[in-house]
């Protein structure tokens, strides 16, 4: 186990030992080890890297350290900064998980049920990645999760750059009857008056958060941005249906032109869950 004192030292340690696995809170790593899915031959511990534990303000953005724990992000001072991310952090499992798990770990693991991921997608956050030799580059969170721009050998997530919107933002999730609050579906929604946009990301139902772009544009077109910005209940319901149909689509029509297969009951339930979450999120954001 290597215990570097700075981010650049950690990157150098990873570059020197390509098989090493970085570890901060270790919540996902230990689960993989206990399940027999991972047997790391070397670890690079990030617990002493103080520069990635806090946050700072920079040009209308918050620069969040990758070592921020969910427990820290759930506190009131952080909630005043980025309410949806704080709500997601508070929902991230039992206290022992929130106390250990980190923002950077949530992103790097990329588990579909990661609560912070749809929030970061809806906020259009970017990553500041540390590279060997002291280099830095920026990567869109959505591009990383979609596999369009992956971390390279020896790289580590240093910070997450999040726009400070001062705009309504909501995070909601649905959980199963068992397990430590693991999401079966989640939604993050932002109403951005400055850009006159609605941005929505659905989590936990696919390998990466899904952005229903047409539904976003449709909802934005209905809002009176210069007035009260409210929408009637039927519009909120239609938005939920629009989002759910986009994210949980109908089966394709067979090539022979026959009847498409019906959605299984579990998939229908998931679609109804997504519709309800999206409807509630937009309603709360506009209220």
Predicted regions and their residues:
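C-terminal structural segment of proteins
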Residues: 1-287
């Amino acid at each position: 186990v290597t215990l570097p004192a700075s981010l650049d030292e950690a990157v150098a340690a990873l570059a020197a030992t390509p098989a090493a696995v970085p570890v901060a809170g270790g919540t996902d790593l230990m689960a993989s080890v206990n399940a027999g899915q991972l047997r790391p031959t070397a670890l690079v511990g990030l617990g002493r890297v103080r520069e990635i534990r806090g946050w700072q303000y920079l040009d209308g953005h918050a620069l969040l350290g990758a070592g921020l724990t969910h427990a820290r992000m759930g506190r009131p001072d952080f909630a005043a900064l980025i309410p949806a991310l704080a709500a997601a952090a508070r929902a991230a499992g039992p206290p022992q998980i929130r106390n250990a798990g980190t923002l950077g770990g949530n992103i790097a693991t990329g588990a579909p049920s990661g609560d912070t991921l749809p929030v970061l997608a809806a906020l259009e956050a970017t990553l500041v990645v540390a590279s060997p030799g002291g280099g830095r580059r920026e990567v869109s969170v959505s591009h990383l999760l979609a596999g369009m721009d992956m971390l390279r050998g020896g790289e580590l997530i240093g910070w997450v750059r999040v726009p400070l919107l001062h705009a309504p933002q909501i995070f909601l999730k649905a959980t199963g009857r068992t397990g430590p609050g693991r999401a079966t579906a989640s939604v993050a929604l932002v109403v951005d008056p400055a850009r006159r946009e609605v941005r929505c990301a659905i989590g936990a139902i696919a390998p990466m958060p899904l952005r229903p772009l047409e539904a976003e544009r449709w909802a934005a077109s209905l809002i009176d941005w210069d007035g009260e910005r409210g929408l009637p209940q039927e519009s909120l319901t239609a938005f939920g249906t629009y989002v759910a149909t986009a994210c949980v689509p109908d089966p394709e029509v067979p090539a022979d032109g026959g009847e498409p297969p019906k959605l299984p009951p579990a998939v229908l339930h998931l679609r109804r869950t997504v519709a309800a979450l999206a409807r509630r999120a937009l309603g709360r954001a506009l209220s």
